[in-house]
């Protein structure tokens, strides 16, 4: 069945151009990974063994991805073979070419021994001063950083089961299920029987404790944080899994665990298979950020079970995941909550697009060899992608019609890596009786156009009071002159009665100066009003332990030019490495005082993960 012409004319091969490997020539039947963590030397010694089977005509070479790893030897079926490390090609690293004399058998074992170096972008080493007291190491492999841990087929198109053994003087946690006897003699053993791409592998080692969260979930973190983490997430995971399994095929990954990383972790969460790595910033001490856990859990189907075949189709990972996250939270908290989250997400996408200096924000991107996949990640994949799926749901007959497709898609095609065109083939085939409706969708704008997607409508029942309050503040900021006038006009109890998500929308609206980003309101011209707002809502905003509130409060203070807040803000920038929070604050600070932003970054740069460090450096225009 052919797709409409607007789609067929753009159909492209699934080839991943972000890898230097010849992954299409081989199937990886199993991967055995032996790691040794050396904290004193800040090195990870690795021996990775791939069970490879040729997929077509015989090839004479294996090409693997590497980046800043020190190679020791390569073996094919236990015998050393010649290899060549070719000149580095930014941003993809150095191609490792393995050419055994006499060629390659149809099926063979390929073993690579290597050591990480100080330039490995996958690994962050933390000293005791950066943790609760003991050294710690963790990896972040998405999107193309696994190649700086071990030589590999570093592409989401290549999947295999894994067995991982880690020798470490401190407890280690890896993607997968920990095996009986793990930890004996300092060797930690994990099995991942479900095939995954290597970027979904993860390693952490340090002073790590463990507590149960439910019948099929545990939390790992430093002992000092264990009570808070168990309190935040205990009892929640099973409830989330039950709701997910109502919508999706059963969860196949064994336990669903959480690893709470040190504060330098660059993301809110990472869907490491079976054990999501999350930032401690998720702990709000009132469970108000736990939707992020639902998001990472939803990746167990979208991203981990069905994976984008290359990074130009990243929305198949993230757009689906946001859609599923909101379906699950809607089932738990009501449809109005789902609608509100969609509205909030679309508003944040519009702000991001306006602040992007001309970035594409197309849903399907052309990620060539010269493009770092890290740099094409944007809210478009998340929000535009989820909005497209919501649009499909509505156009095809609502959840009653769309839900059978969800189970069909993840049930029948689980384990595969797909492109947008393969997804569309599946969609058009399943809804063959509704082809006319599918053909009426503006696919060109949704998939390929830059900027905002076609506008959808959302219920505003949870947003109306928020917008009203924000507009009142903007109106009174112009009219009133004295702090006591604001105190008489506004009550702190109103904002306190809002949910955290509503408080976030309030702050977003206040920061941008109105419901629409098209405005000219300048908070620096209204210092009394800005100070009064923080005073009236001191109990809600000033005492919040939720990082989503804290970082927006700092953003507001910078927007309002409140220089007395700068010392607190610059100190806070050294306390967290979550890019969602620190990058906007650095950018805002740089727009006001570039020298202060640069000096603050230089003070804290070694606290950040290499991925975060490079991103901030680029944001600030520093070499």
From Swiss-Prot:
Main location class: cytoplasm
CDD domains according to UniProt: M1_LTA4H
Pfam families linked: Leuk-A4-hydro_C (PF09127), Peptidase_M1 (PF01433), Peptidase_M1_N (PF17900)
Name of the featured protein: Leucine aminopeptidase 2
Subcellular location: Cytoplasm; Nucleus
Origin species: Eremothecium gossypii (strain ATCC 10895 / CBS 109.51 / FGSC 9923 / NRRL Y-1056) (Yeast)
EC nos: 3.4.11.-, 3.3.2.10
GO molecular function, one term: aminopeptidase activity
């Amino acid at each position: 069945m052919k797709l409409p012409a607007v789609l067929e004319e753009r159909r492209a091969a699934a080839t991943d151009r972000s890898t230097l490997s010849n992954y299409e020539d081989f199937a990886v039947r199993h991967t055995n990974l032996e790691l040794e963590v050396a904290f004193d030397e800040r090195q990870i010694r690795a021996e990775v063994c791939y069970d490879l089977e040729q997929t077509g005509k015989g090839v004479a070479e294996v090409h693997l991805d590497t980046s800043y790893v020190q190679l020791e030897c390569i073996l094919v079926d236990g015998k050393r073979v010649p290899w060549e490390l070719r000149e580095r090609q930014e941003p993809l690293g150095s191609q490792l070419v393995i050419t055994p004399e006499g060629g390659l058998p149809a099926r063979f074992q390929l073993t690579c021994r290597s050591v990480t170096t100080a330039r490995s972008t996958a690994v962050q080493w933390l000293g005791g001063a950066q943790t609760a007291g003991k050294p710690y190491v963790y990896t972040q492999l998405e999107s193309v950083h696994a190649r700086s841990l071990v030589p590999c087929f570093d592409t989401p198109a290549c999947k295999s089961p894994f067995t991982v053994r880690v020798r470490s003087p401190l407890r280690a946690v890896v993607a997968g299920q920990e095996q009986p006897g793990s930890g004996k003699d300092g060797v930690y053993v994990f099995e991942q029987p479900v095939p995954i791409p290597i970027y979904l592998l993860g390693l952490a080692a340090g002073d790590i404790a463990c507590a149960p969260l439910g019948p099929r979930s545990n939390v790992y973190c430093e002992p000092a944080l264990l009570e808070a983490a168990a309190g935040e997430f205990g009892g929640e995971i099973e409830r989330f899994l039950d709701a997910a399994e109502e919508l999706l095929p059963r969860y196949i990954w064994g336990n669903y665990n959480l690893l709470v990383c040190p504060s330098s972790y660059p993301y809110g969460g990472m869907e490491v298979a079976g054990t999501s790595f999350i930032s401690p910033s998720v702990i709000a001490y009132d469970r108000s950020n736990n939707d992020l856990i639902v998001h990472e859990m939803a990746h167990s189907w979208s991203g981990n079970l069905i994976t984008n075949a290359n990074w130009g189709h990243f929305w198949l990972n993230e757009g689906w995941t946001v859609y599923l996250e909101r379906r699950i939270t809607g089932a738990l908290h009501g449809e109005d909550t789902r609608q509100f989250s969609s509205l909030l997400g679309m508003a944040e996408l519009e702000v991001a697009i306006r602040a992007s200096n001309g970035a594409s924000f197309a849903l399907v991107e052309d990620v060539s060899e010269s493009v770092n996949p890290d740099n094409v990640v944007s809210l478009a994949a998340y929000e535009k992608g989820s909005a497209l799926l919501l649009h499909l749901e509505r156009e095809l007959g609502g959840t009653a019609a769309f839900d059978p497709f969800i189970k069909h898609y993840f049930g029948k095609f689980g384990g595969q890596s797909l492109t947008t065109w393969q997804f569309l083939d599946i969609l058009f085939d399943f809804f063959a009786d509704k082809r006319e409706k599918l053909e009426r969708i503006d696919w060109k704008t949704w998939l390929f156009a830059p900027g905002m997607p076609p506008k959808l409508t959302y219920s505003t029942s949870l947003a109306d009071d928020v917008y009203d309050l924000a507009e009142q503040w903007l109106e009174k900021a112009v009219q009133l002159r004295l702090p006591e006038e604001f105190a008489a006009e506004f009550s702190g109890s109103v904002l306190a009665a809002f949910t955290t998500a509503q408080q976030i929308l309030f702050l977003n609206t206040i920061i941008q100066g109105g419901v629409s980003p098209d405005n000219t309101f300048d908070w620096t011209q209204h210092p009394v009003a800005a100070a009064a707002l923080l005073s009236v809502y001191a109990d809600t905003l000033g005492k919040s332990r939720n990082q989503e509130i804290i970082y927006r409060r700092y953003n507001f203070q910078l927007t309002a030019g409140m220089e007395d807040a700068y010392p607190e803000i610059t100190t806070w920038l050294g306390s967290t490495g979550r890019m969602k929070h620190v990058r906007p604050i650095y950018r805002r600070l740089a727009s006001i005082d570039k020298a202060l932003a640069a000096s603050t970054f230089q003070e804290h740069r070694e606290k950040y993960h290499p991925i975060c460090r490079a991103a901030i450096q680029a944001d600030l225009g520093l070499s």
